[in-house]
Amino acid sequence: ENRMFKKKPTASEVDGVQYRRAKLWQIILCACNALLGLTVYSLIGMASYSASIGYGVATAAVGVILTATRIFDAVTDPLVAFLYDRVNTKFGKVRVLLVGGYVIEALALWLMFDVMSSKGFGVVTFTLLYMLYVVGMTINNMTVQTLPPLLSNDPQQRPTIGVWNTIFNYCVPMVFSIVLNVVLLPLCGGTYNQLFLSKAVHIVMIVGGIGTILTCIGISGFDKPESFESIGKREPLKFKDMLDVLQHNRPLQCYIASNASDKIAQQVASQSIIGTMLFGIIIGNMSLSTLLSVVAMLPSIIFAVFGAKYAGKHGSKKGIVTWSAVCMAVAIIMIVYFVAIDPTK
């Protein structure tokens, strides 16, 4: 009878290892980094509108510019990793990088969507501002990826961190999309214009700033030098070491190629101009875009839960390979469909 009420042993008790654990409020606050990352992601999806409306850049040229900046993004990633290894201040490492990344992102987006937009500047200004945004985005994204292992290395607590991140990852874009398209867009005349872009970037800066502050509060208890110390003597990271690993590590090369191609595809597919052509021209109903985005959240959450269980049962490798094949098959079907139909009818 007592066994029924016996407390479940912790991972530390089972493994004999003293794990680091976070409180629930710390996990939730750290998940608030999505308030910056995902609102910015939604805003930058309208970069094609900003380029066309504010800088007079042709739609086709915008696609080339945004895709080409992915190459610049690939250059900034190792540089930021090099920077991350060397930042160590009395205010911590992670908090400094989070605030620094936010400031750079906010400045670039503010200039791009508001201050310098529709002021007579052209393609060069837009490209430089977009590159500045990429720098801030890289700093922020790379730092955010280190938050979960900093919060907890307890295997029993990892699912809790993942659940809260998933909740924010789905809810933030949904709410932000409603705010932009249902609330803000009608107030600005019902069309994507300069007033709408300016108001949108102001909202992102405010919400992103709040998210950054909350994240810094949540991680403050773990943002200490001892959290980053490795066992034994710590050797400084050098560019030579990074190049050596890149040249001789075949799995890493495949991983980089896979992620780079995925990122390019995601960047192109997420541009607002794609949605405009699909819903505005082919389907003829732009409001349907927002409705479908909200409706799609439920199956997305279901698939996220199913995917986590599938990977846990069959392993991450099989999960990625199997569902990548499924996604490729679906993509081929969509391509054949859009080639076969006549969008004028």
Where in the sequence are the language-model features?
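Short, Lys/Arg-enriched N-terminal segments with co-localized hydrophobic residues
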Residues: E1-R3
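Membrane-embedded alpha-helical bundles of multi-pass transporters/translocases
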Residues: F5-K345
